[in-house]
Amino acid sequence: MRAKKQLLAALQDIVKDMGLAWPEKATIDTPKATGFGDLAANIALVLAKQAGQNPRELATRIADALRNRDADITAIDIAGPGFLNVTYSQDFWRETILRAQEAGSAFGSSDTGAGRKVQVEYVSANPTGPLHIGHGRGAAVGDSLARIMRFAGYDVSTEYYINDAGRQMRLLGLSVWVRAKELAGRPVTLPEDFYRGDYIKDIARELMEKEPGLLDLDDAAGEDRCFAYAMSSILDGIKQDLADFRVEHQVWFSERSLVEGGAVEKTFNRLKEAGLAFEQDGALWFRTTDFGDDKDRVLRKSDGTLTYFSSDIAYHDNKYDRGFDLVVDIWGADHHGYIPRMRAAVAALGRKPEAFDVVLIQLVNLLRGGELVAMSTRAGQFETLADVVKETGADAARFMFLSRKSDSPLDFDLELVKQRTMDNPVYYVQYAHARVCSVLRKAAERGIEMPAQLDGASLAPLSGDDEMELLRLLDRFEETVAGAATALAPHHISHYLMEVAGALHSYYARQPILNATEQDVIVPRLALLRAVGCVLANGLSLLGVSAPESM
């Protein structure tokens, strides 16, 4: 937000000139009610003790300095115990249009991240079956967060961790092997916890057709072959489903590579040398209680098998070795209890707490016409992400996933999401962009020319309250993006876009654009709409949602 940046810089200079230190509790906010200026600052209240002055007296002193320093300010009111309510000129707000025109697709970007290297890991579902709708929410959050952080000046790398080691993988191979025998008419005993979905039968049938001698193998070799083929097949399907959902992972990282490459043992040795790993009852333990965990954790069981935690520690060690300043893991909410031990591991690796963060993804309750759809991957009862995207479209699904805070449960009604009405959030926002494009097209058809470059004087007729409201809202875009990146909260963007769309729809309903009686307001209003369209398009792009020009 240009206004907030400008006011902050001016206040910091004033405080410095007073020979005082900038207080940590100083804030600059947008007043929720009208009549209290464009911005409100509490600087006099939190600086009064240090300055040895009454807050209102100090506020008067600061206000006088502000008036002399910033010509864009038209009014400063001192409210209550000493709040500064600052109002900027209409010329100042109209310049938002010029900045949007100049920046185009970069409008709203910033250097907030200052090139900080960030890795975002998301989805990372076991390659034991197709992605379901819950994975889709994590995919939308992770992919959008990466887009937002890049736009805010971070150097972001995205990654999918392939869980291709451990019990679930052995169970996948066994499930396909048993189904292959069953398809061949051989007597089988179905394991209690095997994967039951029809996709397992399909994989078994496909493999038998490609390799007629499959069942000549003994059980161990057969299970290994079935595992390798099934994992490759399922992973290919996952990659395609994500591509169709407009989700990109730059790196696909194998868990097995950590084990076979010696990274896990290397991490064990590192922890032992630091006195943080110890043997007890034939097992290897990690002393996570030294870092605030409620109990120590097993790394290697007494039978020699590795825990998931051991690979995860080695994996994060690898991440930091690759030079990332911040590692962001996006996990299902059922992994909440895993966070303390992972933070302990990061600390044991010698990393600062701020180098690691977790975004939790709450469950998605899939509904169809208000009726809950039961889901279980192992039982083969689930709505795949591919089916959902095919039915609703990627735009609607992504926007719906991003419409609420990620750690809040989400009801996803397939029938509601498909509606092309203003009750559907994605339609509401996309229609606002299409409406802007429609007006601009009609203007061109009527021979109304939009200058390639506008200037402040040509925009002067924009002076209405609703126009100033729109301009102040557009000015907030950069701040909203930066805040979403810092808070790891993509839903901030969807909420903001709903607000912009609402303001645009209201403005369109109240103010004539092409048929305005005052001819001198037509081009300025078109320029305002074009700036709104720029913000809507840029914001939707950050969510991985299209900005249609007609609907």
Curated annotation (Swiss-Prot):
> Which SMART domains does its entry note?
Arg_tRNA_synt_N, DALR_1
Q: Matching CDD domains, A to Z? A: ArgRS_core
Entry coiled-coil feature ranges: none
Keyword Transcription regulation in record? no
The enzyme's first-digit EC class, named in words, is ligase
Q: Keyword ATP-binding on this protein?
A: yes
List GO terms (cellular component aspect).
Answer: cytoplasm
Motif location ('HIGH' region)?
125-135
Q: Which keywords are on file for this protein?
A: Aminoacyl-tRNA synthetase, ATP-binding, Cytoplasm, Ligase, Nucleotide-binding, Protein biosynthesis
| Enzyme Commission (EC) number | 6.1.1.19
GO BP term, example: arginyl-tRNA aminoacylation
Q: Which SUPFAM superfamilies match?
A: Anticodon-binding domain of a subclass of class I aminoacyl-tRNA synthetases, Arginyl-tRNA synthetase (ArgRS), N-terminal 'additional' domain, Nucleotidylyl transferase
Q: Which reaction does it catalyse?
A: tRNA(Arg) + L-arginine + ATP = L-arginyl-tRNA(Arg) + AMP + diphosphate
This entry's Gene Ontology molecular function terms read: arginine-tRNA ligase activity; ATP binding
Q: Kindly list the places in or outside the cell where this protein is found, as annotated in its UniProt entry.
A: Cytoplasm
From the record, give the transmembrane residue ranges: none
Record's family? Belongs to the class-I aminoacyl-tRNA synthetase family.
Subunit structure, interactors included:
Monomer.
Task: Read off the NCBIfam families from this record.
Answer: argS
Name the record gives this protein: Arginine--tRNA ligase
What is the native source organism of this protein?
Nitratidesulfovibrio vulgaris (strain ATCC 29579 / DSM 644 / CCUG 34227 / NCIMB 8303 / VKM B-1760 / Hildenborough) (Desulfovibrio vulgaris)
Organism lineage reads as:
Bacteria, Pseudomonadati, Thermodesulfobacteriota, Desulfovibrionia, Desulfovibrionales
Q: Which gene encodes it?
A: argS
